[in-house]
UniProtKB/Swiss-Prot annotation:
It comes from Carnobacterium maltaromaticum. This is Putative carnobacteriocin-B2 immunity protein. One of its GO terms (cellular component) is cytoplasm. The keyword rRNA-binding does not apply. GO terms for biological process: bacteriocin immunity. Keywords: Bacteriocin immunity, Plasmid. Could impart immunity to carnobacteriocin-B2 to naturally sensitive host strains. InterPro entries: Ta0600-like_sf. The keyword Repeat does not apply.
């Protein structure tokens, strides 16, 4: 794991220990899912995929819960927004990756 992934993993671990996060099913599942994806693969794509998933998940939670969010999740959100805002995520590259992943999962049909 690179340094960004390790830092994110440690922050996810701290967030999971937070009683507010543990009490909320959506946030605890999001943290576990993202931590699992980070440890499952060492590729840069896994980090990009995880921060995209976290950004969407935290944003939707924030908007649907009257703009209240646990501080540990806010820490993670501000950490990953640096990478997203700096353009470290190449959306075209991510789109091609997702298309390729989808095409690989489609069964081949021979006539």
């Amino acid at each position: 794991m690179d340094i960004k992934s390790q830092t994110l993993y440690l922050n996810l671990s701290e967030a999971y220990k937070d009683p507010e996060v543990k009490a909320n099913e959506f946030l605890s599942k999001l943290v576990v899912q993202c931590a699992g994806k980070l440890t499952a693969s060492n590729s840069e794509n896994s980090y990009i995929e995880v921060i995209s998933l976290l950004s969407r998940g935290i944003s939707s939670y924030y908007l649907s819960h009257k703009r209240i969010i646990p501080s540990s999740m806010l820490t993670i959100y501000t950490q990953i927004q640096k990478d997203i805002k700096n353009g470290n995520i190449d959306t075209e590259k991510l789109r091609k990756y997702e298309i390729a992943k989808g095409l690989m999962s489609v069964p081949y049909i021979y006539f």
